[in-house]
């Protein structure tokens, strides 16, 4: 028995997708007679047509579990884009440069010169080596 029409109508009446509409197999004959929206509403109330619960996000995804390096698929830059990587590096370098200036390891003139060429350093340790601790 084709109940496609009833299923579509039930989905529209309930405001849900087709996948969330379940027709009770024991009451198929009752559902097949339904033609109007009112009939469908009555069948939903009686339980012949059931609206399934919305699927949620699994607990493991909610709390960011299973996101370690072994679970990651995709390229190096799809996980941490170049821009994010750059931001992380440059912020660390600027933080270190500011700290050096505050501790008196470099003066204001050196600070400005180094700030301008920070992009040429790959890491904080490289910056420290250049300043010559």
UniProtKB/Swiss-Prot annotation:
Q: Which GO terms describe its molecular function?
A: large ribosomal subunit rRNA binding; RNA binding; structural constituent of ribosome
What does the UniProt keyword field contain?
Ribonucleoprotein, Ribosomal protein, RNA-binding, rRNA-binding
Q: Name one Pfam family in it.
A: Ribosomal_L19e_C
Where is this chain compositionally biased, Basic residues type? 60-83
Q: How does it assemble?
A: Part of the 50S ribosomal subunit.
Which family does the record assign?
A: Belongs to the eukaryotic ribosomal protein eL19 family.
Q: What is this protein called?
A: Large ribosomal subunit protein eL19
Q: What is the lineage of its organism?
A: Archaea, Thermoproteota, Candidatus Korarchaeia, Candidatus Korarchaeales, Candidatus Korarchaeaceae
């Amino acid at each position: 028995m084709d109940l496609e029409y009833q299923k579509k109508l039930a989905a529209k009446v309930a405001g849900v997708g087709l996948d969330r509409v379940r027709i009770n197999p024991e009451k198929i004959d009752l559902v097949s007679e339904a033609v109007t929206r009112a009939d469908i509403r009555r069948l939903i109330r009686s339980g012949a047509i059931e609206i399934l619960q919305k699927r949620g996000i699994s607990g493991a995804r909610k709390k960011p579990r299973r996101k370690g390096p072994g679970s990651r698929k995709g390229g190096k830059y799809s996980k941490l884009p170049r821009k994010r990587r750059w931001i992380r590096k440059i912020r660390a370098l600027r933080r270190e440069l500011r700290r050096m200036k505050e501790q008196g390891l470099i003066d204001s003139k050196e600070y400005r010169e180094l700030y301008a060429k920070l992009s040429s350093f790959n890491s904080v340790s490289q910056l420290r080596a250049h300043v010559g601790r």
